[in-house]
């Protein structure tokens, strides 16, 4: 009887374990498929795949991971992988923007805005992963010597959510980049078509000119030389007439300028004479008054000097 109960208990536990582990497999299947696509895609996808592999390793929460999470090594490596991913993504985006030059400005701006938003979401997802690991390290260090099972469970749950969000945003970014690339290809094809449309009339004109030259080649050389001489003569006469007209205009303009200069010089001369006369009328009375004062002063000085040199009468008489 005990053996029967033991067999039933083992069967029940095995069934429970199968029910618990069963939902995990479909969850990781798209992730593995997405990882395989990244490893065979663009350089930015390869860099994101390396970030993804590192995140899967961290999510195992093995003993080695637990030890390294207590040091900044994990976050430093994640930062390096993040920077590498964003750098490759920006380079790929710049390459696509160069190919989008023939596309309309409005379309290019809209695609660029959507791609920047998707790129920002992917960067924010990776930044959340790093921030969560930094927070976990701080919490573990604060609970040193205590049980961290609850912290590990919370971290595992957060990492699963962040990984799903990262997968979703990376897939969205891939789709938008595909649209971006399709727009670049379409723009390049439109550019080629536009060039072909512009070159078509030129080619036709060249064909017409070639036909005209061929027909002219059949004419006698003397007739063509005579026609060319007449055209040159008419052209020279036209240029000579224009030159003479231009010279006449220049002469008239020079005469007008000379007349204006002479008139201005005469006006300036009259103004100078009037100003000189005005100055003379101002200063002549002043000069005459100064001369009179000076003469009076000289007379007074002479009188004073004469009085001082007169002989003094003697008292002997």
Curated annotation (Swiss-Prot):
<comment type="similarity">
    <text>Belongs to the apolipoprotein A1/A4/E family.</text>
</comment>
<feature type="repeat" description="5">
    <location>
        <begin position="168"/>
        <end position="189"/>
    </location>
</feature>
<dbReference type="GO" id="GO:0071831">
    <property type="term" value="P:intermediate-density lipoprotein particle clearance"/>
</dbReference>
<dbReference type="GO" id="GO:0006707">
    <property type="term" value="P:cholesterol catabolic process"/>
</dbReference>
<dbReference type="GO" id="GO:0097114">
    <property type="term" value="P:NMDA glutamate receptor clustering"/>
</dbReference>
<dbReference type="GO" id="GO:0001937">
    <property type="term" value="P:negative regulation of endothelial cell proliferation"/>
</dbReference>
<dbReference type="GO" id="GO:0097487">
    <property type="term" value="C:multivesicular body, internal vesicle"/>
</dbReference>
<dbReference type="GO" id="GO:0051651">
    <property type="term" value="P:maintenance of location in cell"/>
</dbReference>
<dbReference type="GO" id="GO:0042981">
    <property type="term" value="P:regulation of apoptotic process"/>
</dbReference>
<keyword id="KW-0967">Endosome</keyword>
<dbReference type="GO" id="GO:0005886">
    <property type="term" value="C:plasma membrane"/>
</dbReference>
<dbReference type="GO" id="GO:0051044">
    <property type="term" value="P:positive regulation of membrane protein ectodomain proteolysis"/>
</dbReference>
<dbReference type="GO" id="GO:0006898">
    <property type="term" value="P:receptor-mediated endocytosis"/>
</dbReference>
<dbReference type="GO" id="GO:0010977">
    <property type="term" value="P:negative regulation of neuron projection development"/>
</dbReference>
<feature type="repeat" description="8">
    <location>
        <begin position="234"/>
        <end position="255"/>
    </location>
</feature>
<dbReference type="GO" id="GO:0046911">
    <property type="term" value="F:metal chelating activity"/>
</dbReference>
<dbReference type="InterPro" id="IPR000074">
    <property type="entry name" value="ApoA_E"/>
</dbReference>
<dbReference type="GO" id="GO:2000822">
    <property type="term" value="P:regulation of behavioral fear response"/>
</dbReference>
<dbReference type="GO" id="GO:0048156">
    <property type="term" value="F:tau protein binding"/>
</dbReference>
<dbReference type="GO" id="GO:0010976">
    <property type="term" value="P:positive regulation of neuron projection development"/>
</dbReference>
<keyword id="KW-0813">Transport</keyword>
<dbReference type="GO" id="GO:1902995">
    <property type="term" value="P:positive regulation of phospholipid efflux"/>
</dbReference>
<dbReference type="GO" id="GO:0010467">
    <property type="term" value="P:gene expression"/>
</dbReference>
<dbReference type="GO" id="GO:0033344">
    <property type="term" value="P:cholesterol efflux"/>
</dbReference>
<feature type="region of interest" description="Lipid-binding and lipoprotein association">
    <location>
        <begin position="210"/>
        <end position="290"/>
    </location>
</feature>
<dbReference type="GO" id="GO:0070062">
    <property type="term" value="C:extracellular exosome"/>
</dbReference>
<keyword id="KW-0325">Glycoprotein</keyword>
<keyword id="KW-0850">VLDL</keyword>
<dbReference type="GO" id="GO:0034360">
    <property type="term" value="C:chylomicron remnant"/>
</dbReference>
<dbReference type="GO" id="GO:1903002">
    <property type="term" value="P:positive regulation of lipid transport across blood-brain barrier"/>
</dbReference>
<feature type="region of interest" description="Specificity for association with VLDL">
    <location>
        <begin position="278"/>
        <end position="290"/>
    </location>
</feature>
<protein>
    <recommendedName>
        <fullName>Apolipoprotein E</fullName>
    </recommendedName>
</protein>
<dbReference type="GO" id="GO:0010875">
    <property type="term" value="P:positive regulation of cholesterol efflux"/>
</dbReference>
<dbReference type="GO" id="GO:0034362">
    <property type="term" value="C:low-density lipoprotein particle"/>
</dbReference>
<dbReference type="GO" id="GO:0098978">
    <property type="term" value="C:glutamatergic synapse"/>
</dbReference>
<dbReference type="GO" id="GO:0034372">
    <property type="term" value="P:very-low-density lipoprotein particle remodeling"/>
</dbReference>
<dbReference type="GO" id="GO:0060228">
    <property type="term" value="F:phosphatidylcholine-sterol O-acyltransferase activator activity"/>
</dbReference>
<feature type="region of interest" description="Homooligomerization">
    <location>
        <begin position="266"/>
        <end position="317"/>
    </location>
</feature>
<dbReference type="GO" id="GO:0044794">
    <property type="term" value="P:positive regulation by host of viral process"/>
</dbReference>
<keyword id="KW-0358">Heparin-binding</keyword>
<dbReference type="GO" id="GO:0070374">
    <property type="term" value="P:positive regulation of ERK1 and ERK2 cascade"/>
</dbReference>
<keyword id="KW-0558">Oxidation</keyword>
């Amino acid at each position: 009887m005990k053996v029967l109960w033991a067999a039933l208990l083992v069967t029940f536990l095995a069934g429970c374990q199968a029910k618990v582990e069963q939902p995990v497999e479909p969850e990781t299947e798209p992730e593995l498929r997405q990882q395989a696509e990244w490893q065979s895609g663009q350089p930015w996808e390869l860099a994101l795949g390396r970030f993804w592999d590192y995140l899967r390793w961290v999510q195992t929460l093995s003993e080695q991971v637990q030890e390294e999470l207590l040091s900044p090594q994990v976050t430093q490596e994640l930062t390096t992988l993040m920077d590498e991913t964003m750098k490759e993504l920006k380079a790929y985006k710049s390459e696509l923007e160069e190919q989008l030059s023939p596309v309309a400005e409005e379309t290019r701006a809209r695609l660029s805005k959507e791609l920047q938003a998707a790129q920002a979401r992917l960067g924010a997802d990776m930044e959340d992963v790093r921030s969560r690991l930094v927070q976990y390290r701080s919490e573990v260090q604060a609970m040193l010597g205590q049980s961290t099972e609850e912290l590990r469970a919370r971290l595992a749950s957060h990492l699963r959510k962040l990984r799903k969000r990262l997968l979703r945003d990376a897939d969205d970014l891939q789709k938008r980049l595909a649209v971006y690339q399709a727009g670049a290809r379409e723009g390049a094809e439109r550019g080629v078509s536009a060039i072909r449309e512009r070159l078509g009339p030129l080619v036709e004109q060249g064909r017409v000119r070639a036909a005209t030259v061929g027909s002219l080649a059949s004419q006698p050389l003397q007739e063509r030389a005579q026609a060319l001489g007449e055209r040159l003569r008419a052209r020279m006469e036209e240029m000579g007439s224009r030159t003479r007209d231009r010279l006449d205009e220049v002469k008239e303009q020079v005469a007008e300028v000379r007349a204006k200069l002479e008139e201005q010089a005469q006006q300036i001369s009259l103004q100078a004479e009037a100003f000189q006369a005005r100055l003379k009328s101002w200063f002549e009375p002043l000069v005459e008054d100064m001369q009179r004062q000076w003469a009076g002063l000289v007379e007074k000085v002479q009188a004073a000097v004469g009085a001082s040199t007169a002989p003094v009468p003697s008292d002997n008489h």
